[in-house]
């Protein structure tokens, strides 16, 4: 039976926070539901987030001072908490994104050379 969506991806520990920071950096202030939907869209539906997962990340990021929150009105006229990246969060995003790129490059090199050696 064909699938409309790619296989679901289980996020590695800590990667959701990176995705939330990146989403807020790219799109500006958003409410939790909007952040979750944007991550799902950007991942091609490979990452599906429930409310508990996204809000746990938002609380954690707010406690660390990487995002701020304030109440506002959503598109459908409901009260919603909007989250925004702080200057500290911007610095953390840059650090985590660089760390992620370094780790994935190393893993890529190892996977590209399954027989060991220098690859030369």
Residue ranges and their predicted role:
Residues 1-14, 96:
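Intrinsically disordered, low-complexity serine/threonine- and proline-rich regulatory segments
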Residues 54-61:
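Basic amphipathic alpha-helical segments that dock to polyanions
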Residues 15, 19, 80, 84, ...:
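Amphipathic alpha-helical recognition patches that constitute DNA-binding helices
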Residues 10-53:
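N-terminal helix-turn-helix DNA-binding core of bacterial DNA-binding proteins
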Residues 2, 88-120:
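Amphipathic alpha-helical dimerization/coiled-coil segments
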Residues 62-79, 84:
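Beta-hairpin "wing" of winged helix-turn-helix
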Residues 31-32, 82, 93:
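Amphipathic alpha-helical segments enriched in hydrophobic/aromatic and basic residues
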């Amino acid at each position: 039976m064909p699938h409309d969506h790619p296989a679901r991806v289980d996020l590695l520990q800590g990667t959701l926070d990176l995705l939330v920071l990146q989403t807020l950096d790219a799109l500006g202030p958003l409410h939790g539901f909007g952040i979750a939907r944007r991550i799902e869209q950007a991942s091609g539906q490979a990452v599906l987030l429930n409310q508990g997962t996204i809000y746990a990340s938002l609380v954690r990021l707010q406690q660390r001072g990487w995002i701020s929150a304030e109440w506002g009105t959503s598109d459908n006229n409901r009260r919603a908490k909007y989250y925004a990246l702080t200057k500290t969060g911007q610095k953390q995003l840059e650090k985590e994104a660089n760390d992620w790129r370094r780790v994935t490059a190393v893993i890529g090199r190892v996977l590209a050379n399954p027989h060991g050696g220098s690859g030369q």
